[in-house]
Every structure is written in structure tokens, then in C-alpha cells.
């Protein structure tokens, strides 16, 4: 007998997947004739609502001698998530059609269970056209290329690593702290020098990890949003990078770090670098004081995941919101420099109101501006801080970092069951709005994950420490096997819906476990040439 319902087949549900508000959905269920169903109802509720609404099915004939067909329509008129299921009144009492694990195949049960998700997004929601069919390339600026230009730096509290091919400093200092203060001096002019290389690879978008002034080499501890870090160059260097990239048909997007700043910043100024009596830590009359959440000023304050160097900001503070999203704020200023959009760090920690304001700022400057959020799970039904998030409903993000696809692809390459992998992929395709699917940021590696080659071919990390990670290197046989499997992974990456993203150096055979081993410098002149085709859309022809 056929299954009663399958939400991923258009025989049972049209249209497939997420829908615009006001779209009528036609549903069909198949029921055993010997169940003697007297009435069938579609049960629907809006997200967190407690009350279910019921819509009657009509009997529409028989599928075969043992199966009958029932059909109904439903029209969601409000954006958000809906949950639906099926209630049957039969000769034998109440029965329910419910999704059953592990592959979403439905069964008829005597009690209600899980429901199916329906995503309803804003009518007219569109996403930028330019990412479609292109390739994104992620660059950690300190580690991609050094232009050779020496900077006139006033800062002295950092370590310059003169061996481009060395491991980043991974051991703690004498105080037991990891300071991330070793720099390889990669810069914006160095990226500009390599634009021809990126164009040749087929890159259409560069995603830059943070470039604003900061203490650390990763620059997620912003010191001054308005200035490019002097080690990277100047604001003019960024303007020139965007202009030169545009000549080659390449867009540039920046990393927006707006859930926290650095403690060593002009805004907080714990260390006094920006003056003796400035910043929220040193002056309660500071214009930035209201940005932060002090329990007991100055030393007891909210910080990101307990890191005292990353004080959290109150994103709903009017002064902070104006500074970032205002008419002359940071978002618009960089868009005017030539920036084509933003990747938002820890998007699940940014309030809806803030992201709505940011979207308005971006789209007013450039209707084709691209906004990507860092979300590790299914972003359509993500909850954070006790609330359902509205990332993909047409009022906040255009796209998210698609870690669900990444995990599924790499799991498959490591031998995971194909049905399980397919279910992970199809759940995203079913739950995400079509405008989002076409621009999903599909990465196999990022600055926050192990390199794809290491995941596929190396020993599992299994919580091993940095000492162990520092001493690992793939053997010849591991690398050979990893090459073949990486081709498979990239083939999937390029053929699934979305905007494939290459993490710098993956195409050159870089390996590495967790930070900082996944952040080594691009191996110019030492590339593993068998990998250089991996960013090309012709991967399946190789």
C-alpha cells in the first residue's frame, strides 16, 4: 500500500516546500479502505499557538482497490511557521497520520505525534540575482597574501611571524592565555594582487573575514568599526580592492561583528589604548556607555560566552543601532566604499529588530546588497533565547551559512547512510524559501571548522588537544584517498541548490583541524596542484 502522505512529493502536496503568504496549498492523503474513514481533517496551528484549526478533507475517489483518496486546501495568510497533521475519524476510533523517523515516511497511529513544518514567507521576498551561478571565496585576510608593502605601524604589542609557511601560534603565553596576537601580515593590497588568480578560478564573490581595526589576528574583537586595521592597510585600500574586483566581475562582502566588540576598543577601552578617560569601561559618561551591559561597573559586565575580551553590546540601544545602521552608519559607509553585502557573525544572537534595521540600510544603499547570517542549524525553525527566529521570512537575511549541507556532504564522504544524508538535504530544501535556496552559502570548510580534507581523510578529532593537532599531517595514502573523496564532496557542493563557497587554500590542498590549524597561510608556490580544479564549476568534467 502507498504511504498515507509524503510532504516531499508533489502528488501529496503542491506546491512543494516553503510558500509565499497567501498561497493556496493542495494536500492529498491516501487511506486504506478497510480503515472505513468517516471524516478526515487537516489540523493546522501557527507556530507557538496552542489551538489547532481543522479543515475538512473531501473524499475524491479511489487510488486502487484497497486505497481511497482524500483532498483539501489550505491558505496561510501570515508569515511564519505553521505545523500541520491529519486527524481521521474511523470505524475503529480516532487515528492520526504522523511523520515517522528516520526518513519522514508517514504512518497511521492511534495517537498524535510530530507534525509537518510549513514555512510561509513574505509576499514579494526576493534575494540578489548576482550570486546565482557564481562562486564565493572566503579569505582570512591575515593569511591569504602579503603584498610586501611595509606599514608605518604605531602598534608594537604583536608578534610578526616571518615564516609564511609556519603554523600559527597555538600554545598559550606565560599567563596561560591564547592571545591570537601573532600576525603573518597578509593585507588588502595582497588580496588585490591576487584578483587575477581568483578571476581565473571563476570566483564571483570574495567574503572577507573582519577587516576593521582590532587587537587579534582574526579581528572578531573589533577595536574601531570605522577604520580598516592598519596591519591590513587603509580604507582607501579597501575601496581600491572593491573597485578592482568589480572590474573582474567580482563582488566583495564584509564580515559584520555586531553582537560584541573588543574590550580593547575605542568603545570599551579596558586597556586604555584609546585614551586614559575614554570608553565605557573608563567613563560612565562615554557616548558608548549605553552600548554595554554592566552588572557592576566597570569590571562586572556581560561578555560573549564569558570571554572578558569580548564585551557584549545591547543591539537594541538606539545609539548603537544608529552607529551601525543609521544614515551615516557603518553598514552604509562600507556599502558606499564598494562593499556588496555582509556576513553577520553569530546571527542567532542578534535581535530581529536589529537585523530588520540592517536589512533596510543595506537594501536602501543597494537593492542587490547581499546579507548572509551565521546559523549552524536549520535556520527556518531556529530558536534562540526562548524565541523563534525570523531569519528567512523576507525581513532579515537573504541567506545563511549552510552548515546542514556541509555536515551531510562530509558525513556521506565518510560513509554515512545515503538515505540519512538525503533526508538532511531535503529537509533544508523543503523548509527554506525558494529565494533563499538559490543563494545559500554552501561551504565545505570555514574558519570555524576543520578543513574538509582533514575531515574526510584524517583521523577524527575526538576532542584531542592542540598539541596532538599540531603534530598531525596526512600521509600519502590518506591524501590520495582524500583527493578522490574531496572531488565527490565538491561535486555535491556545486550541484545542490545554493552559492558554493571555497575557503581559501582548500583548492591548494591545505589541511588542518580546529582553530588555529585551519587558518594557516595560503601555500603560494607550494600548492598541491592536483587540487587546483576544485573551485571550478567544471568539477564533474574532470
Q: What is each stretch, according to the model?
A:
Residues 135-137, 206-208, 252-254, 342, ...:
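Hydrophobic faces of well-ordered beta-strands that scaffold small-molecule active sites
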Residues 532-538:
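Conserved small/polar residues in nucleotide/adenosyl-binding loops
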Residues 443-471, 490, 497-529:
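Aromatic/acidic polysaccharide-binding cleft in carbohydrate-active enzymes
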Residues 1-35, 109-110, 115-129:
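Non-catalytic, glycine-rich low-complexity segments
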Residues 242-251, 259-260, 265-276, 330, ...:
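Active-site-proximal helices and loops of the catalytic beta/alpha 8
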Amino acid at each position: 500500500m502507498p504511504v498515507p502522505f509524503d510532504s516531499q512529493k508533489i502528488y501529496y502536496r503542491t506546491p512543494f516546500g516553503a510558500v509565499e503568504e497567501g498561497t493556496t496549498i493542495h494536500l492529498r492523503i491516501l487511506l486504506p479502505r478497510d480503515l472505513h474513514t468517516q471524516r478526515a481533517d487537516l489540523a493546522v496551528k501557527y507556530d507557538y499557538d496552542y489551538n489547532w484549526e481543522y479543515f475538512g478533507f473531501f473524499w475524491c475517489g479511489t487510488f486502487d482497490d484497497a486505497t481511497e483518496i482524500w483532498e483539501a486546501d489550505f491558505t496561510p495568510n501570515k508569515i511564519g511557521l505553521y505545523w500541520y497533521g491529519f486527524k481521521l475519524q474511523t470505524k475503529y476510533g480516532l487515528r492520526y497520520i504522523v511523520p515517522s523517523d528516520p526518513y519522514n515516511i508517514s504512518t497511521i497511529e492511534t495517537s498524535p505525534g510530530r507534525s509537518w513544518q510549513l514555512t510561509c514567507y513574505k509576499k514579494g521576498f526576493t534575494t540578489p540575482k548576482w550570486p546565482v551561478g557564481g562562486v564565493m571565496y572566503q579569505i582570512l585576510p591575515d593569511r591569504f597574501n602579503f603584498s610586501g608593502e611595509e606599514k608605518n605601524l604605531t602598534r608594537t604589542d604583536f608578534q610578526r611571524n616571518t615564516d609564511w609557511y609556519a603554523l600559527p601560534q597555538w600554545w598559550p603565553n606565560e599567563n596561560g592565555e591564547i592571545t591570537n596576537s601573532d600576525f603573518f601580515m597578509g593585507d588588502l593590497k595582497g588580496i588585490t594582487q591576487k584578483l587575477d588568480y581568483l578571476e581565473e578560478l571563476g570566483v564571483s564573490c570574495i567574503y572577507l573575514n573582519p577587516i576593521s581595526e582590532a587587537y587579534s589576528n582574526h579581528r572578531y574583537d573589533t577595536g574601531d568599526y570605522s577604520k580598516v586595521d592598519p596591519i591590513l592597510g587603509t580604507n582607501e585600500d579597501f575601496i581600491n580592492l572593491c573597485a578592482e574586483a568589480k572590474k573582474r566581475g567580482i563582488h566583495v562582502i564584509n564580515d559584520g561583528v555586531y553582537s560584541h566588540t573588543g574590550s580593547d576598543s575605542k568603545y570599551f577601552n579596558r586597556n586604555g589604548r584609546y585614551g586614559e578617560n575614554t570608553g565605557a569601561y573608563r567613563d560612565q559618561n562615554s557616548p558608548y556607555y549605553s552600548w554595554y551591559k554592566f552588572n557592576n561597573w566597570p569590571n562586572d559586565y556581560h561578555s560573549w560566552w564569558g570571554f572578558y575580551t569580548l564585551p557584549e553590546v545591547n543591539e537594541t540601544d538606539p545609539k548603537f543601532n544608529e552607529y551601525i545602521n543609521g544614515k551615516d552608519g557603518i553598514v552604509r559607509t562600507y556599502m558606499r566604499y564598494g562593499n556588496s553585502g555582509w556576513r553577520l557573525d553569530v546571527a542567532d544572537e542578534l535581535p530581529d529588530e536589529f537585523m530588520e534595521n540592517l536589512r533596510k540600510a543595506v537594501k536602501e544603499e543597494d537593492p542587490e546588497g547581499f546579507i548572509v547570517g551565521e546559523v549552524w542549524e536549520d535556520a527556518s525553525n531556529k530558536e534562540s533565547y526562548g524565541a523563534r527566529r525570523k531569519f528567512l521570512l523576507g525581513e532579515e537575511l537573504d541567506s545563511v551559512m549552510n552548515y546542514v549541507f556541509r555536515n551531510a556532504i562530509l558525513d556521506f564522504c565518510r560513509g554515512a547512510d545515503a538515505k540519512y544524508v538525503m533526508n538532511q538535504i531535503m529537509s533544508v530544501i523543503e523548509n527554506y524559501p525558494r529565494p533563499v535556496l538559490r543563494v545559500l552559502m554552501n561551504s565545505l570548510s570555514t574558519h570555524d571548522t576543520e578543513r574538509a580534507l582533514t575531515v574526510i581523510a584524517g583521523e577524527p578529532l575526538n576532542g584531542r588537544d592542540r598539541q596532538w593537532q599540531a603534530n598531525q599531517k596526512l600521509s600519502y595514502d590518506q591524501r590520495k584517498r582524500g583527493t578522490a573523496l574531496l572531488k565527490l564532496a565538491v561535486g555535491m557542493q556545486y550541484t545542490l541548490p545554493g552559492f558554493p563557497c571555497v575557503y581559501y587554500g582548500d583548492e591548494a590542498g591545505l589541511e588542518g583541524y580546529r582553530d588555529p590549524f585551519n587558518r594557516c597561510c595560503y601555500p603560494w608556490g607550494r600548492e598541491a596542484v592536483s587540487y587546483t580544479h576544485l573551485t571550478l564549476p567544471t568539477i564533474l568534467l574532470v
